[in-house]
């Protein structure tokens, strides 16, 4: 005869307390800067976490698409065992339209959520936390 494990009610803290490890990444608030040929869009990256690999529990930084491209290239070079997902594609027409900017914002958020949520990258990447949390991140420092 097999023993039936005792069941118990979860405590209030178990139900409503913070999860053991959590990571929330949001890409929001796109802003277009410059004029004419020098225009570009930047995006706010908001991170909330209690994962030790990230120095700050809450951070907000701003990055442009080209920063994401450099970041992805650096990740690929430093993390040969992990397949880094693609970024949303380059856009050459109407790239400052609301629809295009929103589509890109969604793609950048999906990219960061996948990358930041990967356990090997959380523990092994030197650039990950810096890109997501350091307002003075410099693509040329890597």
Curated annotation (Swiss-Prot):
Main location: cytoplasm
Domain PX stretches: 21-138
PROSITE patterns: PX
SUPFAM superfamilies linked: PX domain
Compartment(s) where it occurs, according to its Swiss-Prot or TrEMBL record: Cytoplasm; Golgi apparatus membrane; Prevacuolar compartment membrane
Keywords: Cytoplasm, Golgi apparatus, Lipid-binding, Membrane, Protein transport, Transport
GO biological process: endocytic recycling; late endosome to Golgi transport; protein transport
Membrane topology, from the record: Peripheral membrane protein
A Pfam family reported for this protein in Swiss-Prot or TrEMBL: PX
GO cellular component terms listed in the entry, alphabetical order: early endosome membrane; Golgi membrane; retromer complex
InterPro entries, A to Z: PX_dom (IPR001683), PX_dom_sf (IPR036871), PX_Grd19_PX (IPR042138), Sorting_Nexin (IPR051074)
Gene Ontology molecular function terms on file: phosphatidylinositol-3-phosphate binding
Family affiliation: Belongs to the sorting nexin family.
Protein name (database record): Sorting nexin-3
